[in-house]
Amino acid sequence: MSEELLKLLKAEGLDLLSCMHCGICTGSCPSGRHTGLNTRRIIRDARKNRAAVLSDYDLWLCTTCYTCQERCPRGIPITDAILELRRLAVREGLMLPEHRFVSEMVLECGHAVPLDEETKKKREELGLDPIPETVQKDPEALEGLKTLLKTCKFDELVAKK
């Protein structure tokens, strides 16, 4: 068992040891119908193998709809546990490349989707301001956001480790 991981989760009020592996979580998961997400396996792996669960791609397939958590006969906060596992994974530098890219874009330009010249042109053709009312339009706000993200150490969190 991954005692350290279980202690971390339990400290957050997420006790996974009462799971009886009935599979209701997996059977009721809307995301699992279309992806490889198997919540029961994630819970099992969290109990057995820290490295495996934190580096599992499927950990990121959960849409956080809370269906599994609402239907769990033992009342295990499964979705909350998955969110905490994700937080732990990110702290260890384990992040999907797509998430890292979006995070880097936010750090760089204050927005997950940067504006390119083509998008600005299309906006103008539609009668819109080429730059929407976001921090991208206000250099002072952008600098404020960057300062906030650095103060929160978001830049360190998303840096490749």
Swiss-Prot record:
Which positions does UniProt annotate for [4Fe-4S] cluster 1 binding?
A: C19, C22, C25, C72
Gene3D superfamilies of this UniProt entry?
Alpha-helical ferredoxin
Cofactor remark: Binds 2 [4Fe-4S] cluster.
Q: What class of enzyme is it?
A: oxidoreductase
Where, per UniProt, does this protein localize? Cytoplasm
Keyword Metal-binding (UniProt): yes
Listed cofactors: [4Fe-4S] cluster
Which InterPro entries does the entry link to? 4Fe4S_Fe-S-bd, 4Fe4S_Fe_S_CS, CoB/CoM_hetero-S_Rdtase_csu, HdrC_iron-sulfur_subunit, Helical_ferredxn
Instruction: From the UniProt record, list the reaction(s) this protein catalyses.
Output: coenzyme B + coenzyme M + 2 oxidized [2Fe-2S]-[ferredoxin] = coenzyme M-coenzyme B heterodisulfide + 2 reduced [2Fe-2S]-[ferredoxin] + 2 H(+); coenzyme B + 2 oxidized coenzyme F420-(gamma-L-Glu)(n) + coenzyme M + 2 reduced [2Fe-2S]-[ferredoxin] + 4 H(+) = coenzyme M-coenzyme B heterodisulfide + 2 reduced coenzyme F420-(gamma-L-Glu)(n) + 2 oxidized [2Fe-2S]-[ferredoxin]
Entry function: Part of a complex that catalyzes the reversible reduction of CoM-S-S-CoB to the thiol-coenzymes H-S-CoM (coenzyme M) and H-S-CoB (coenzyme B). Catalyzes the transfer of electrons from ferredoxin to CoM-S-S-CoB during methanogenesis from acetate. Electrons transfer from ferredoxin to CoM-S-S-CoB via HdrA2, HdrC2 and HdrB2. In addition, the complex can use electron bifurcation to direct electron pairs from reduced coenzyme F420 towards the reduction of both ferredoxin and CoB-CoM heterodisulfide. This activity may take place during Fe(III)-dependent anaerobic methane oxidation.
UniProt cross-references to PANTHER family, sorted A to Z: IRON-SULFUR-BINDING OXIDOREDUCTASE FADF-RELATED, IRON-SULFUR-BINDING OXIDOREDUCTASE FADF-RELATED-RELATED
Q: Which organism is it from?
A: Methanosarcina acetivorans (strain ATCC 35395 / DSM 2834 / JCM 12185 / C2A)
Domain named 4Fe-4S ferredoxin-type: residues: 10-40, 51-82
Assembly: The ferredoxin/F(420)H(2)-dependent CoB-CoM heterodisulfide reductase is composed of three subunits; HdrA2, HdrB2 and HdrC2.
Q: Which GO terms describe its biological process?
A: methanogenesis
Give a GO cellular-component term: cytoplasm
Known EC number: 1.8.7.3, 1.8.98.4
> According to its UniProt record, in which pathway does this protein act?
Cofactor metabolism; coenzyme M-coenzyme B heterodisulfide reduction; coenzyme B and coenzyme M from coenzyme M-coenzyme B heterodisulfide: step 1/1
Binding positions ([4Fe-4S] cluster 2): C29, C62, C65, C68
Instruction: Name the chain's protein.
Output: Ferredoxin/F(420)H(2)-dependent CoB-CoM heterodisulfide reductase subunit C
